[in-house]
Every structure is written in C-alpha cells, then in structure tokens.
Amino acid sequence: FEMGDIEFNGKMYYGLMLNLNCYRGEVHVRVGTTKDCIVLKNSLVGDFNIGKRRYVSLNGEREIKGLDAGYYQVLYDGKDMILKQIRVELYDRAEFPSGNITKVFVPKVKYWLVKEGQVRQIRKERDLQRVYKPFKRDIKSYMSHHSEKDMDSNLVYLMSMVEGAH
C-alpha cells in the first residue's frame, strides 16, 4: 500500500493508503492503520494516483475502443498519450524431483499509444518510428545510445521529443 488520491463515485479523496491488485484488477483502500482493506467497485473508480504514479480507469462509460476495461498507468499525457497496462497471471510450476507444485505470479506489461482516438500497441520503442515518421532518425539515434530495458523512461523521453518538449 502507498499513499495516494482517488476519485470515487464522482468525489475526490486525498491521502489514502491505496493498492492496485493487478491480478484481480481491483483497487484496495486500507482502513486507517489497521490491516483491513476495502475493495472498491470498479465502475465507481475514476482516476487515481498511487505514490507518483498516475492511473486512469477505463471501466464502463470511460472505456476506450481497442483497450480492455481496467486500470492503466499514464506514462505520458500530451497531445497523444502512452498508457502502461500491467496484468499479473498465475501459473503452476512443478519442481523436480520433489514433485512440489508452486504457484507463480508473472507480470505481463503492455504499452499503448492513444493518438487521435486510435489505439496502437507499442512493443518496443522503435515502434514509435512507424507512427512518427518525421522523427524516425531522432528516435533511432536516441535508441542507439539507450538500453531498451528501461522502456518507461525511454517512451516518456521519446514522446516529449516528438511533441516538442526536448
């Protein structure tokens, strides 16, 4: 749980302890200083912040065509928007020779570009070259000097470059 703010049922609440359960797609609010928590109804949750991370709720009327309903982290919000979708899947893993089966949570991350109402999946930073053709050389130059392991900050930098902030 981290400190955050949330819009719930059209009203803002500040300074709450929040947690996003990516496996179940739920937002949890801790009750005071106890270990108890409340699971919020998805259809009533609006945008929220957990720590310094901002999230949008794309449930019900707020859905964007081409994206699954759920919560998305906003990495970049300018003329165009980059959203990060985090899902967690549960797998059984058998250990040999003991024969024990353990449950393993595996995070699955997808990045989405929302440009002029159209949604496109971004698998690598280089996918932006196809969308922003005038900046193809700049994107290629940037990526030749930066690791593709830090996708979040690379996408933020590239989008701010494309939209004229750098």
Regions found by a protein language model. Name each.
Residues 2-122, 126:
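Aromatic-patch recognition
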Residues 130-166:
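Long, compositionally biased interface segments
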